[in-house]
């Protein structure tokens, strides 16, 4: 069995060593829930990577959005290049769920655009979980939505060995039943083709295809082939092919499901008639009978997911089968930014149920549509073996459920959490102006946090009227303009940035030495303990970082945030004294802010074009091979540009330029 092997050019330092040891001890002791409470910039991802390498268990990492998941996926890929690091997020580029708005009598049909490469990566994740244990899956909340049964996916796989007697006709029928499409002209992911005694299968979860060569009815050779160059990558003695989709059914599943759907339809029609909902009953009868006819003839119908419970043989109310069911029972879960991710996981079920209930009440769907849903919070928790929550500001759930809370407070740079002052609101604007001018004289920047957009805009106008170069950021500012504003702040073109919630920027601003929080004692989301600690962390990149809270009274949230910051600062100062460390402001080039924002947008694009770029690197040693590859890449680039996927087109363009430079260097 292959083990996790961590590759890193640096070793754990500071609090990382103790945090790794504590988490590993907890996992070995059987602790079900633990929390890693680490300040921003303390290297929490590297700590998690070390824990994975020492515990040696299949791992699921959940983040709260695709962008962060893509960043984590890339980091873990770098730490574990020899192991299976997989990416499991929603495969929809665009998704409009089916819904009904009673107030407007408006029915909205489901509309979606599926991303083929993300779909391949989802299948690759389940394939790896079936075949090996050294697996890390980085996912979003998509992992709590329904998938096909792992038993069906495993039981329906096809196994082929060299010297095996093989009926090609039978193999073709099996592949079609596994949702593979025959296409003898173009071989792509999820397809197969037959040429005489040779059958080529492109598994839906791989980036290369298999060629099975037969001598009459006997298998003589199995090879893995590169799809672009045609080069033989490896020869095998045996081969296992899994289904091309997660939702695959055994032969008797559809007839059995249709009987159950008819029974539920009859019961629901009686109920609607008794409630004098005749229009709803007629609508439901027409729609469901059409779906049944399609299921009987084609084995499929539009919106088949609404019949997932009857098809899978689940009882009403039973939890759906999800990605978590594909993991072995001893897997470990890491929840990144748990103070955001856990509430998001818990909210998915209720939001889905409200939408489905309208469809059921007004005769668009049978009650079984409710069972096509994400996991409830309690169901999700019941599937967990061991979990580690990761956050700088753990929520109530993490704090109450964790066997231990492991702190990681020391930054490798020696930087401390900022000093905090509380001042009365009387004369607050004049005080802010003086502090901003003092910062500007030292070539430092300032942030001012307000509660409303109007106040942010008015304050910006006021400061500009005083000659203080100021800009504002809020939800109406587009991404590109936001990047330009943040860049101008770092470059000194702007002295002050005013905003409402600057937490979501996710960008380090080492020049910021002063943060003013207006109305700091107002109770609400923007001034909760968690939000205040996150805001305070914005000044933790500068050695002279200071935060001033303007309030006429100290709220509980303020008190907790101040006490927590003071506690951290005391620990950090003691560590620095003991080790002779002098905190120094982080030095970053101004371009870093643009690069990082562009990296966020490019992460998803890299995932899309990764197979194509790897193919371009595989066999381009000759001028002819490079010329052929450039032509293929240029075609893909134009397709991406036509579909407005500009980040992907740019990555392909860069690869074309790289290949052309190789020819120039070789004098071709």
From Swiss-Prot:
GO terms for cellular component: cytoplasm; excinuclease repair complex. It is found in: Cytoplasm. Keywords: ATP-binding, Cytoplasm, DNA damage, DNA excision, DNA repair, Excision nuclease, Helicase, Hydrolase, Nucleotide-binding, SOS response. It comes from the Bacteria. A motif (Beta-hairpin) lies at residues 91-114. Residues 25-171 form the Helicase ATP-binding domain. Residues 431-594 form the Helicase C-terminal domain. Its main location: cytoplasm. GO terms for biological process: nucleotide-excision repair; SOS response. Disulfide bonds: none annotated. One of its GO terms (molecular function) is ATP hydrolysis activity. The keyword DNA damage applies. ATP binds at residues 38-45. Residues 627-662 form the UVR domain. InterPro entries: Helicase/UvrB_N (IPR006935), Helicase_ATP-bd (IPR014001), Helicase_C-like (IPR001650), P-loop_NTPase (IPR027417), UVR_dom (IPR001943), UVR_dom_sf (IPR036876), UvrB (IPR004807), UvrB_inter (IPR041471). CDD domains: DEXHc_UvrB, SF2_C_UvrB. The beta-hairpin motif is involved in DNA binding. Belongs to the UvrB family. Forms a heterotetramer with UvrA during the search for lesions. Interacts with UvrC in an incision complex. The UvrABC repair system catalyzes the recognition and processing of DNA lesions. A damage recognition complex composed of 2 UvrA and 2 UvrB subunits scans DNA for abnormalities. Upon binding of the UvrA(2)B(2) complex to a putative damaged site, the DNA wraps around one UvrB monomer. DNA wrap is dependent on ATP binding by UvrB and probably causes local melting of the DNA helix, facilitating insertion of UvrB beta-hairpin between the DNA strands. Then UvrB probes one DNA strand for the presence of a lesion. HAMAP family: UvrB. This is UvrABC system protein B. It comes from Treponema pallidum subsp. pallidum (strain SS14). The gene is uvrB.
